[in-house]
């Protein structure tokens, strides 16, 4: 989820 949506 925001701010990270890179799927890591």
From Swiss-Prot:
Similarity section: Belongs to the allatostatin family.
UniProt function note: May act as a neurotransmitter or neuromodulator and play a role in the integration of information within the brain. May be involved in the control of visceral muscles due to its ability to behave as potent inhibitors of peristaltic movements. May also fulfill a neurohormonal role on muscles of the gut and heart.
Organism: Calliphora vomitoria
Tissue: Neurons within brain and abdominal ganglion.
Compartment list: Secreted
GO biological process: neuropeptide signaling pathway
Modification Methionine amide, positions: 8
Modified residues (Hydroxyproline): 3
Keyword Secreted among record annotations: yes
Protein known as: Callatostatin-5
Coiled coil: none
Keyword Secreted recorded: yes
Highest rank taxon of the organism: Eukaryota
GO cellular component: extracellular region
Keywords from the UniProt entry: Amidation, Hydroxylation, Neuropeptide, Secreted
């Amino acid at each position: 989820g925001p701010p990270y949506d890179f799927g890591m």
